[in-house]
């Protein structure tokens, strides 16, 4: 919305006196900063009202697994669906500060809200039925896959460059794997995988939101560089015109995430729920596909990959041998069973996320 101010200054001569000031709205960096502040302020201002409303409507709050760590039973009654706070702040910040004519913004936002709706319905069933399982995992994955496939098809159609359906290999200069139209399926796998990996990570207060913000900040930088022809040429990365605007969307999420963390810090006043975790993971996946840095997402989001792999390994091992590799999965629960306190796990996982983000960003230069 604010992006139109510079257009008004060109259309109506009366705005000419303010043209120097309004010119700052041309800059993605300025609008990204504005989106950060807007997202944070929205959640700070409306967060308490949303939490009170959800607490009243949900009554008993999110069900707690009885087979999990006993310390989690103290969290009984905490409302869930906190992702609504994040998605609201994200949407407001994006609508106000992003270029409304940029298709990449709307595609990624559609994936985010679509995954958020799937997570919301899952949370709704858990709360109303007071069970730790929502609707069937197969149906949920099918809906997520449908959303992701449509989004990836749209992304490929936007960029007719043959490289748009190729996979770039980090660290290796000019090395790509050409997938053709199969890239649509691969991209959908990345988006769905990212959504569910973040969902599995969201098991402790503050555990998921900070790594998500770290990954988002990293991809804000990548999107800005990939969307700038000069920087992309200098770094020898794929130039994707228009994707720089995704930095504004990332900024809105950073601000909304900071606001949510205020209320999610231990002891949490609200849980993100599937509403937030699926949406944020799906958003990261969609941005990675849009800017052609899918493998880099696996590095920067390595913590999410670790959580997802721990569940897969646990399930496969138990089905094949009847034995479990970890005391409990996802892996953050394994460390709880080993005696680590919740703050120890959360902060150490944050540190790992920072190191992985630095490793992922290093791929931009090391080629």
UniProtKB/Swiss-Prot annotation:
CDD domains registered for this protein in UniProt: GT_MraY
Family annotation (PROSITE patterns): MRAY_1, MRAY_2
Necessary cofactors: Mg(2+)
GO molecular function: metal ion binding; phospho-N-acetylmuramoyl-pentapeptide-transferase activity; UDP-N-acetylmuramoyl-L-alanyl-D-glutamyl-meso-2,6-diaminopimelyl-D-alanyl-D-alanine:undecaprenyl-phosphate transferase activity
GO BP of this protein: cell division; cell wall macromolecule biosynthetic process; cell wall organization; peptidoglycan biosynthetic process; regulation of cell shape
Assigned EC number: 2.7.8.13
Locations listed in the record: Cell inner membrane
Membrane topology, as annotated: Multi-pass membrane protein
Pathway: Cell wall biogenesis; peptidoglycan biosynthesis
Chain coiled-coil ranges: none
Record's GO cellular component terms: plasma membrane
The reaction(s) this protein catalyses: UDP-N-acetyl-alpha-D-muramoyl-L-alanyl-gamma-D-glutamyl-meso-2,6-diaminopimeloyl-D-alanyl-D-alanine + di-trans,octa-cis-undecaprenyl phosphate = di-trans,octa-cis-undecaprenyl diphospho-N-acetyl-alpha-D-muramoyl-L-alanyl-D-glutamyl-meso-2,6-diaminopimeloyl-D-alanyl-D-alanine + UMP
Xref: InterPro entries: Glycosyl_transferase_4, PNAcMuramoyl-5peptid_Trfase, PNAcMuramoyl-5peptid_Trfase_CS
Keywords: Cell cycle, Cell division, Cell inner membrane, Cell membrane, Cell shape, Cell wall biogenesis/degradation, Magnesium, Membrane, Metal-binding, Peptidoglycan synthesis, Transferase, Transmembrane, Transmembrane helix
Transmembrane segments: 34-54, 78-98, 101-121, 135-155, 175-195, 206-226, 246-266, 270-290, 295-315, 344-364
Family: Belongs to the glycosyltransferase 4 family. MraY subfamily.
Alphabetized NCBIfam families for the sequence: mraY (TIGR00445)
Function: Catalyzes the initial step of the lipid cycle reactions in the biosynthesis of the cell wall peptidoglycan: transfers peptidoglycan precursor phospho-MurNAc-pentapeptide from UDP-MurNAc-pentapeptide onto the lipid carrier undecaprenyl phosphate, yielding undecaprenyl-pyrophosphoryl-MurNAc-pentapeptide, known as lipid I.
UniProt name for this protein: Phospho-N-acetylmuramoyl-pentapeptide-transferase
């Amino acid at each position: 919305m604010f992006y139109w101010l510079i257009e008004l200054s060109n259309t109506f001569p009366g705005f000419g006196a303010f043209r120097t000031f309004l010119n700052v709205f041309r800059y993605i960096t300025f609008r990204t900063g504005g989106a950060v502040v807007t997202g944070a302020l929205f959640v700070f201002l409306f967060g308490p009202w949303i939490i009170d409303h959800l607490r009243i409507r949900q009554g008993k709050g999110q069900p707690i697994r009885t087979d999990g760590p006993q310390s989690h039973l103290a969290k009984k009654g905490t409302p869930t669906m906190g992702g609504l706070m994040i998605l609201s702040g994200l949407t407001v910040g994006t609508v106000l500060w992003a270029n409304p004519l940029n298709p990449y913004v709307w595609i990624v936002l559609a994936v985010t809200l679509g995954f958020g709706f799937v997570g919301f319905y899952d949370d709704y069933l858990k709360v109303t039925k007071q069970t730790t399982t929502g609707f069937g995992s197969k149906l949920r994955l099918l809906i997520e896959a449908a959303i992701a496939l449509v989004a990836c098809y749209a992304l490929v159609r936007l960029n007719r460059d043959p490289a748009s359906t190729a996979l770039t290999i980090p660290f290796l200069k000019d090395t790509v794997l050409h997938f053709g139209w199969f890239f649509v399926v691969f991209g959908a796998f990345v988006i769905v995988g990212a959504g569910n990996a973040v969902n599995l990570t969201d098991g402790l207060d503050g555990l998921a939101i900070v790594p998500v913000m770290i990954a988002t900040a990293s991809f804000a930088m990548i999107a800005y560089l990939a969307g700038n022809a000069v920087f992309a040429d200098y770094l020898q990365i794929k130039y994707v015109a228009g994707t720089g605007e995704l930095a504004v969307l990332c900024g809105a999420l950073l601000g909304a995430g900071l606001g949510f963390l205020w209320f999610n810090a231990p002891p949490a006043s609200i849980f993100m729920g599937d509403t937030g975790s699926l949406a944020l993971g799906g958003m990261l996946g969609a941005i990675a596909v849009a800017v052609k840095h899918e493998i880099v997402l696996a590095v920067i989001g390595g913590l999410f990959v670790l959580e997802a792999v721990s569940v897969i390994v646990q399930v496969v091992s138990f089905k094949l041998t009847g034995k479990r590799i970890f005391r409990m999965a996802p892996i953050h629960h394994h460390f709880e069973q080993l005696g680590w306190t919740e703050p120890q796990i959360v902060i150490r996982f944050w540190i790992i996320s920072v190191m992985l983000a630095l490793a992922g960003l290093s791929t931009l230069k090391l080629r």
